[in-house]
């Protein structure tokens, strides 16, 4: 589904959720965010349901649980960062689970963000927060909504990073203040352990 068509479908679904759950006499589509937890906790499309997985391979069990009682013609919309994962998801839902009305966001959130900015800048994005990206930026802020919770203090933030302790390097949501206080590390343990390792190597 092209990004602008996706945008309109989400707007229709938002309206329908307040109108007895139907879009033009059709059921509201189920919208699934097929990314992992660390991605969805800082940004998500309005009305979407995250799979809450730690790894993509866990998605199949989640789909079986969420869709076990749904009719096979239930409208299902899926999306991910760049669209690749949803090609696999679409094939699984149709070929393995028998669903007949499955669509995906072509090009993923990246294409949606770019297309909306280029072709419909007056439209309010239906994606809220930050899109996790797999490059040096880590996150691309699409709206100012701070959906994430700092792992250190619990405050709302949109900032994503990787722990700078090379032995950890975990993906984390951490506010600017805590990131500075912990020198880019996720915890006191990571901060102190790395200092110990550095000191040890200098004395050897």
Q: For the regions a protein language model found, what residue spans apply to each?
A:
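Rhodanese-like catalytic fold shared by cysteine-dependent sulfurtransferases
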Residues: 7, 16-19, 27, 35-75, ...
């Amino acid at each position: 589904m092209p990004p602008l068509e996706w945008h309109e479908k989400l707007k229709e679904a938002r309206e329908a959720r307040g109108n007895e759950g139907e879009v033009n006499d059709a059921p509201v589509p189920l919208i699934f965010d097929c990314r992992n937890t660390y991605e969805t906790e800082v940004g998500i499309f309005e009305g979407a349901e995250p799979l809450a997985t730690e790894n993509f391979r866990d998605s199949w069990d989640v789909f079986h649980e969420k869709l076990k009682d749904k009719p096979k013609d239930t409208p299902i919309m899926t999306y991910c960062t760049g669209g690749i994962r949803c090609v696999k998801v679409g094939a699984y839902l149709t070929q393995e689970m028998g669903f007949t009305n499955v669509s995906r966001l072509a090009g993923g959130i990246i294409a949606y963000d770019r297309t909306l900015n280029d072709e419909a800048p007056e439209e309010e994005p239906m994606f809220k927060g930050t899109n996790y990206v797999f490059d040096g930026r880590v996150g691309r802020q699409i709206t100012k909504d701070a959906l994430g919770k700092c792992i250190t203090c619990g405050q709302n933030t949109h900032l994503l990073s990787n722990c700078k302790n090379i032995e950890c390097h975990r993906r984390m949501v951490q506010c600017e203040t805590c990131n500075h206080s912990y020198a880019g590390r996720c915890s006191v343990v990571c901060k102190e352990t790395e200092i110990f390792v550095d000191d040890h190597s200098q004395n050897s």
